[in-house]
Every structure is written in structure tokens, then in C-alpha cells.
Amino acid sequence: MTTFSTCAAFLSLVVVLHAVHVGGAILESQAPHRELKAYRPLQDNNLQEVYASSAAAVHYDPDLKDVNIVATYSDHYGNIRLGRVKMGDLSPSWVLENPAYQVSRKTKGSQLVIPRDSFQNDTGMEDNASHSTTNQTDESENQFPNVDFASPAKLKRQILRQERRGQRTLELIRQEKETDEQMQEAAIQKSMSFENSVIGKYSIWRRDYESPNADAILKLMRDQIIMAKAYANIAKSKNVTNLYVFLMQQCGENKRVIGKATSDADLPSSALDQAKAMGHALSLAKDELYDCHELAKKFRAILQSTERKVDGLKKKGTFLIQLAAKTFPKPLHCLSLQLAADYFILGFNEEDAVKEDVSQKKLEDPSLYHYAIFSDNVLATSVVVNSTVLNAKEPQRHVFHIVTDKLNFGAMKMWFRINAPADATIQVENINDFKWLNSSYCSVLRQLESARLKEYYFKANHPSSISAGADNLKYRNPKYLSMLNHLRFYLPEVYPKLEKILFLDDDIVVQKDLAPLWEIDMQGKVNGAVETCKESFHRFDKYLNFSNPKISENFDAGACGWAFGMNMFDLKEWRKRNITGIYHYWQDLNEDRTLWKLGSLPPGLITFYNLTYAMDRSWHVLGLGYDPALNQTAIENAAVVHYNGNYKPWLGLAFAKYKPYWSKYVEYDNPYLRRCDINE
């Protein structure tokens, strides 16, 4: 017994485990227990888990089963803990080593070494343990040099595992960067291709986005007025005078309180009290006069009366807009008079007659860039010329052929005499000097002589004519029969020596060099233009009468329309195909206006049918004279912007946001403009 006690005392072991991380890793691994033997509970549950998960099979002498093993460890909170376990509770894989065989170790006495290879097959435990031991290897070796933490094979696996983790981390980072770059590129492409012409029409400031109750009281008070008038009419018909007077007084009070308010915020503080008072009056009227059938009749009469008023206001608005659009502003009229007076007073008319042949060679040189502008508006024409020259790379190669009427010829000549752009060549002609342009040759002039056409146009502003043909007011404008408007169909006759010419309207602004237009291969077509059709809009059936068999049998109703305003004409192909003859043929057929209304675009669509080359839309952006929601980027990137419509930039009707594109080419410091009070 003494021998056994001595031996037990001699072999009593104190195992110090540095478990700051190793213990935690084993705890978290939750690896399956293999061949565990029952052992008594330890003082701390965490230590129990350490031994239960790590002690796979202990090898020891059966006589030493009562030897105590004391272990220290750190729990999850960093506190140092002690635990005891009997040798008999450990697995057989635990071995006793004699320190005499450990040459590299200097400590004396027996040591207990945990053979980690005994649980290498446990994958989860291996991963977690290796992660913890890797971070704490140096520290453990310094504090506990007697503990063999891992075999060389285990260390190699740990190193390989760390390398794989590093490679995987780098791969994930690379994939994340690639994904971010792809998302950014997709977002950029989406933003570049995003069309916001429609979205631009919406704003959070629009009434659509106001609170639905923002004008609840205002609407209530207006509805009360309608109800009160209906009951008042019934009261009057039934000789209930007191109630009639009371209701009309309340109507007047409601109108006074409403005033010019457009929302509840504009109403005075007494509005709600007045609405309550009117509600009380309507309640009294309902109790005394309510008759469903009678009320329905009154409301129907009010509705019909209101509809008639709305129709009348629409007609009036249409007429006034058309009137304003075709009216020549007083400042522009002043400008023409001042220029014409100075032209003749200073004798420039005689001097020009002597010098008119000086630049004849340039005017007929087909290698230069020739423009045709037909207008009676001096200021508008000057903007077209200035914007073209200022944006041209070679202004000396640009030649402008301007044709105006007899009334504005002197003013146009005077303006370009004193304000001629540098280098460019300007020719101003009078349409009345074209003797070949007469009624025997020109269909439009011949039609103008008919009494029916004169009646249709020159009495268009008569009240009876307005009420009868309000829908056609746009076309009932004598300017549509002006020869300046139809001279575009006679370009080969006006310029017989030229091969190509660019036609420009006087309501356009040039923003880029137009010289590349002469290099476009039009593939044998006569007219180069930008198409205007979008979905079902601006197609042939919008302009032509397809109920007429002459139209329906020769043209496609769904054919895409295009725009006048900036058109490249191949005059050689024009002469070859006798385009002017085609125009005359269809113009004669439309003498009674059954094929199309009027204007120059419908006969243009017919004349150049299947002979029009579609140019890129960026060359010509239209709609600045009628559409307030155009794409701003498209406008700024366009070579030419066109103010087609009633809201011309020189009129007070113009859209303020579009006017700067035009006004920046106006010389507002010019003495003539200042004299006529033409300013921004």
C-alpha cells in the first residue's frame, strides 16, 4: 500500500493547458464524440466540453486510474479556471512520456502529451482548432514549451489550409470588384440610353403631385355654388322668394371668399365658416324644395350651358393664337421700315445695281456650300445666317441665296450690306424679278386668282367663317399661298448652275458646322430630310385625305413623314426626274382642296414620295415652337434646332427656356434694333 502511494505521488501529474484559443476552438467545433467513456462532472461545464471533445482515447496504466489531473484554462470571457479529472476518466490514447527521452526539453518529471493526431479525422474540429492554434503558436510555445501542439503533417495541413483561405479570399475580392465594375458599367449604359423626353413632362410641382386634399375646401365651395343656383332656380319657379334671395346671397358670399384662389392655402381664414353657412342654406333648401326630377333637369341645363361656354372659349383661344402667330410684331415692322428708308435715302439701290455682278462666280460655283433662304423676316434671316457662319469651319466657302418679296427687298439688302458676316457670300433677290414665275406656269398662282380661294382665305377672319371652320383655322392663313412658301419647289429654275443646295427655313438656328451634309451619299434620292414619325404620329394619313381614291391608290397611309426646315436637295437628280412637274400635277388635282388642306408639307410628301433620304435625327431637332417638353440633351446636341409651330422665338408667345438658343445670335447692340426697341 505504501509502495502504491509512493508511486502515485511520484506519478502525480499537473497538466497545464494553455486553452485561450485551443479550448475555444474545440468547444465551437462540436465534433462527434468517438468511444467516449463516462467520467465524473468537472467543476466547470466548459472544461467538461474540452475533455469530452478532445480526449478521444487515453492510454494509461490501470493502477493509476485514481491519479488526479489538474488543468488550467481560460473561458470565453478570459477568466482563468481550474478543473480536476481522474486518469481513469481519460481515453487510452493518452500516453505517459518520460522526460528523459525528450532531449529538447529541460523540465523534469513525467509529462502528459496530448496526441493531436488522434483526432485529425474530425474535420470540423480540425478546422477550428487549426485556426486558433495558428494565431497563438508563438505565444503557446513560449509559455508552454513542453506541450506538443501539432505534428508536422498537421502543421503542413494548416499551412495549406491557410493558403487556400487566402486564395479564396483574393478570389472573392476579385469577383466582388468585377461585379461592382459590371454594375457601374450597366448603370452608365442605362443612363446614356435613357430617354427622358416623356419624363421631362412631369414634375413634383405639378398639380398631379399635390396633396389630394390641397383644394378640398375650394372644390366644396364651388360645388356649393352650383347646388345653390340649382335650388335658387327651383325656388324662383315656385315663388319661394325669401329662399331664392337667401341662396343667391350665399352664392355671392362664396364667390367673394373664393376670389382668385387656386388652392385652400389661398383662401381667407373665414372660408370654412362660409362653407358651413352655405351648407346650412343648402340643407334648408333641400328640406323645402328637394325634387329629384327637377334637380336633374336643372343640372342638365347647367352642364349644357357650361359645355357651350367651354367650346366658345376654345374657339376663341384657337383664333387668338393663330392671329398672334401670323401677326407681324410692331418692333420687327419698325426694323423693316427703318432699313428700307435708309436703303433708298442713301442711294444704295443704285450702287448695288452697279456691283451686282462682282461675286457672280462664287454664286454659281458648285464646289462651294450653297444655302437657300426664302423669307420676308429680316431679323429671323439674320439669325440663320449668323448662326451658320459662326459655327462653320470654313466660312469663306459658304454662300447664302436669300429671296424675299418686293416690300422687304430694300430692308433685307440694307441689313446685309451693313451687317454682312465676315468671309461668307450673301445674295439677296426679289421674287418679283423672277419673270418666269407666273400664273401660266405656277399652279399656286393660278389657283390664287380663283374667286373661291380668295373667299376661303381672305375672309377667313370673318366671325361666321370662324365659327364654321374653327378646326381649319391653322390652314386658313394666306401665308400658305405665299410664293415664298412654295418657291422651294422651283429650286432648279432659281439656281440652274448649282448641283446641290441646302434649304433652310427662317425659324431655325444652326449650332454646328453643316459642311458634312454635302458629303452624304443620298443614294440617288432627291431630298435629304429628317423623318418625324414616332409610332403612329406624323405619318401620311395625318396630312393627306386617304378617303380619296387618288391618294389611297398611290400612297401608303403608314409611310413616315419628314420635315421641311433643313433639306438637302440634289438638283441634278431633281432635273433628271422632273420633280417640279410632279408637284404641278398633284397641285392641279388639289384645286378644290380635297386631297389635302393646304401648306407646303403635304404636296412635299407627295412630290418626294420614295425619293427622300432619311438623315440622322441629330441633324435636325424640331418642335421648339409648340412642344414645351423636348429633350434638352437632344436640343443641345442638334446641328439645327427648328422653332416650327406658333411659338416663334421673336414673338411674345415663345417658350422662355428655348428662346436663348435663338437670341444669342441676335445683335441686340445694333443701332437699328435699339431704335426699334428690340431687346431680350
UniProtKB/Swiss-Prot annotation:
- Region Disordered: which residues? 118-146
Q: Name one GO molecular function term.
A: polygalacturonate 4-alpha-galacturonosyltransferase activity
Bias (Polar residues) occurs at 130-145
Indicate the enzyme's highest-level EC class. transferase
- List, alphabetically, the InterPro entries matched: GAUT, Glyco_trans_8, Nucleotide-diphossugar_trans
Give the record's membrane topology: Single-pass type II membrane protein
Lumenal-side segments: 28-680
Per the UniProt topology annotation, the Cytoplasmic ranges are 1-6
Which Pfam families does its entry note?
A: Glyco_transf_8 (PF01501)
Query: Any phenotype upon disruption?
Result: No changes in the cell wall content.
Task: Kindly state one GO CC term assigned in the UniProt record.
Answer: Golgi apparatus
UniProt keywords (A-Z) are: Cell wall biogenesis/degradation, Glycoprotein, Glycosyltransferase, Golgi apparatus, Membrane, Signal-anchor, Transferase, Transmembrane, Transmembrane helix
Q: What is this protein called?
A: Probable galacturonosyltransferase 3
According to its UniProt entry, this protein's organism is Arabidopsis thaliana (Mouse-ear cress)
Lineage, highest ranks first: Eukaryota, Viridiplantae, Streptophyta, Embryophyta, Tracheophyta
